[in-house]
Amino acid sequence: MRKDFGFEQRPMVDWLAPGQLTQTGIKSVISDIFGSYADKRDVMAALHPKPEIDGDYSQESELWIDYAADLGDGFDATYTVARTLAEPQLSLEHGGQTHVLPRGRLLVMGGDQVYPTASFDEYFNRLLKPYEAAFPRSPQGQEPHLYAIPGNHDWYDGLSSFTRIFCGQGWLGGWKTQQRRSYFAVKLPHNWWLWGIDIQLEGYIDKPQLDYFYRQSLDNVQANDQVILCVAEPRWVYGVTKGAEAFRSLRYFEDRHLHQLKPARLKVTLTGDLHHYVRYESKDGEVQRITAGGGGAYLFATHGMPEKLALEEGFKESVRTVEYEKKASFPDTATSKLLTFGSLLIPIRSWKFGLFLGVFYTLFSWILQSASKARPDLLAGSRSLMEYLQGQSLGNGPRVLKTFAALIVNTPVSVLLCLLIVGGFMAFCSARRKIARFVIGSGHGVAHVLLNLALMWLFAHVNTHGFGLGIDSWRQVTLFVLEMLLFGGLLGGVL
């Protein structure tokens, strides 16, 4: 980590490193357990009880808004995005024409401003200082304004750091923060509004926040005003891929505050969380739902996103089905499919993960080999599992699997290791539905156990028949350990 500028220029988070996985998992559990007892939104509402709007730009004839989400990861990516946002103007070529885009009068940060988990130290090194280096503080009166909503990574410390940075009307580089809460309402020109809501903690919207937007709808929003809504997750996608419940709280908010109180028109919903760009448009062309999580975190595939969505919008008696179609994405589908081959490099890019799997496979093999010497009755007369495997051809696959399973069941430590790896993959499975998490996670774990068996079988043949080494010789044992660490780590990392 370089410290040339008074802060650590940190690398991208290695999400697959065993230590990082453990740390993130523990903090996630702690956040889930204690988060509801440390909800800063109640405190913010008590300190600022008046439901005032956070910014009024309605008198301006033209207003440009920049948007970035999923930001504070590695220095290189974060600084690149920050420097692009700081440019006075950008010139883009499209359709044979040059379009000049001025820097936004407002910058909206759409969630997950820091990785891997929220703390002031991580914000300082991964967000504050890179943005300050890219865009130092502007002269008073000329500064662009900043608004932000928290994502799940911002919530890991109960919003303590988020509140300190974004809700004190301070500075983030050359941008001046304006809001007093983790949500905001901003009045834009030409009867438009920009609302940012906080729905991260347990997926619900707290009552003070609902009251705040209730007063905005009742007192400030006029009939047929148009609203841009910023949220931290693309719940319209999760409602299709992870169950209708994922879309429920957002449905309620939209129906209650944008349709029932006053017939305002929701025109655009902006979010991050998925690290790509995908835009869905309603069938009548009136509503855009946009995921734009390209603020610097790792790129997420787009080719698996649904081409069409049929969303149940509204709540209770006002429920209706609205159809959406995917209109644009970055990367495009072909490029996204091509980029997936980069997963083959995971054992190299995340070598700690590959090494962990190699060590796990080696340990598992050692335990089974040792246990098998006490159960020759399971090995058709062979003295050990490796001796048994080197004498089995591929045609005996079912018999080998049966023997392998019998050894595991009769070795308590092996059972515990199997439960550990299966449970680990279930815990870190990204599927929201419990049944999907169970099926995918357990299947992934079992696949690693089977890969371990296949490698033991392969190395038993290669080392004895190919190199002529005795099963119990120190040369064979040393070679086996090296093979399992190398090839187990590489193949396991890809799997």
Region annotations inferred by a language model:
Residues 232-234:
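Active-site beta-loop-alpha junctions enriched in small/polar residues
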Residues 1-109, 114-116, 121-150, 156-185, ...:
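Acidic, histidine-bearing metal-coordination/catalytic regions of metal-dependent phosphoesterases
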Residues 118-228, 238-326:
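Extended active-site neighborhood of metal-dependent phosphoesterases/phosphodiesterases
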Residues 70, 109-110, 195-198, 230:
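Conserved beta-strand segments of the P-loop GTPase G domain that flank and frequently precede/overlap
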